Amino acid sequence: MSTHELKSWPSQFQAMWTSLKRAEFRRDDRGYQVGDLLELREWDPSRQQYTGFQLTARVTHLVRGPELEVPAGFVVLSIEVLGARVVDSGSRPG
């Protein structure tokens, strides 16, 4: 099991925060597996910084490749949100 820290744009983050969204479409560049944890940090692209809100989610299912016509190099991750918290706002990626 791995933990992946990921940026999430405000509209997508809010949909997860309010339980409207339970899947992520991502580049398949991290070797995602069922059981992995995602640390999703809300990113404000206009200010080029994190907002301070973070969700932790577990990957419960994934789809790669031609199954369901997922483009090569991408993955669909079904997620279960485990919790949310406020972290240091305004921090910039390293």
Language-model features, listed with the residues they occupy:
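Glycine- and charge-enriched low-complexity intrinsically disordered segments
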Residues: 50, 63-94
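Short, basic/aromatic beta-hairpin or loop at an interaction surface
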Residues: 1-22
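Short, charged beta-turn/beta-strand-edge "cap" motif at the junction between a beta-strand
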Residues: 43-48
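A structural micro-motif recognizing beta-strand termini
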Residues: 26-29, 80
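Short coil-to-beta-strand transition motifs
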Residues: 49-58
